Amino acid sequence: MDDGDILTLGNTSIRFVHTPGHTKGTISFFYDVKENEKTYRVGMFGGAGVNTMFKTAFDFDGCREAYLASVELLKKEKVDVFIGNHTWNNDTYGKSLKLLNGENNAFIDDKIWGAFLEHCEKRLADVIAEDP
């Protein structure tokens, strides 16, 4: 998939965004879902990890700058449902338990996306401070 490509599966159209940094080819994606007659935007940052930002692990020169540019690009996306690369990114397990207990859909949270992206920026700043 390339930046801006859209893949349609049934009634769902997934938009892909090239977000290099973690690796050169990192892709993030966005699509809409409906629940109770309401439409929500789902988003996933395909390369949130900063482990490749240490100089000994650089995937490519300029990866730190590319990562920050990707985070800035992703901040412009409106996301109601954030899907993490790993379950700890968005407390998948805890939110699933809430659903099983009949609570409101904890996955719908339009604030977690921005908070997670800010967390990604801080993690990179920590890496740069440790490994300038």
What are these regions (language model features)?
Residues 104-132:
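C-terminal regulatory/interaction regions
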Residues 6-8, 13-99, 105-107, 111, ...:
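Metallo-beta-lactamase
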